[in-house]
A protein has these predicted regions:
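Glycine-rich phosphate-binding loops of nucleotide-dependent enzymes
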Residues: 1-127
Length: 127
C-alpha cells in the first residue's frame, strides 16, 4: 500500500508526503491523487468528467498538467468539459454530443478558441 502511495505522489510531482491527510489537500491535489491512482493501476482509459469544476486557477492548471501527463504516458483519456479553453488546450479530438448523440467531431487545434466557440454556437442554433 505504501508503494502505491509513493507512486501516486511521484506522479503528482509536488510536496505531498505519505503523511499528508486528504482533508489538507486542495481540490486540484485531490483530483491529481485520483488521476495518479488510475495511472498506478495502468488504466488504459481514464475518464475525467468536469475535472476542473469548482477549482481555482492554480488547481485548474494542475489538472490540465495531469491530463498532459496522461497523454504523454500513451493512455487514452476521455475529458468531459464545458470550458472550451481547457478543451482547446488538451484535446486531440472534440466530439460534440446532443442528448447522447454525436452531432459533430472536430480537431480543436484547427481553430482558435473564439472560432471554436462560434462553431459550437452555430451548431447549437442548427439543432
Amino acid at each position: 500500500a505504501q508503494q502505491i502511495l509513493l507512486d501516486v505522489i511521484g506522479f503528482r510531482g509536488v510536496g505531498i508526503t505519505v503523511d499528508s491527510t486528504v482533508a489538507n489537500l486542495s481540490g486540484g491535489e485531490r483530483q491529481g491523487i485520483a488521476i495518479g491512482r488510475a495511472m498506478h493501476y495502468n488504466a488504459d482509459l481514464i475518464v475525467l468528467d468536469e475535472p476542473t469544476a469548482a477549482l481555482g486557477v492554480a488547481e485548474v492548471r494542475k489538472v490540465i498538467d495531469f491530463v498532459r501527463k496522461i497523454k504523454q504516458s500513451g493512455r487514452a483519456c476521455i475529458y468531459i468539459e464545458h470550458n472550451l479553453a481547457h478543451v482547446h488546450e488538451v484535446a486531440d479530438r472534440l466530439v460534440v454530443l446532443d442528448r447522447g448523440r454525436i452531432v459533430s467531431e472536430i480537431i480543436p487545434k484547427d481553430m482558435t478558441v473564439p472560432e471554436l466557440t462560434e462553431y459550437l454556437i452555430d451548431l447549437q442554433h442548427k439543432a
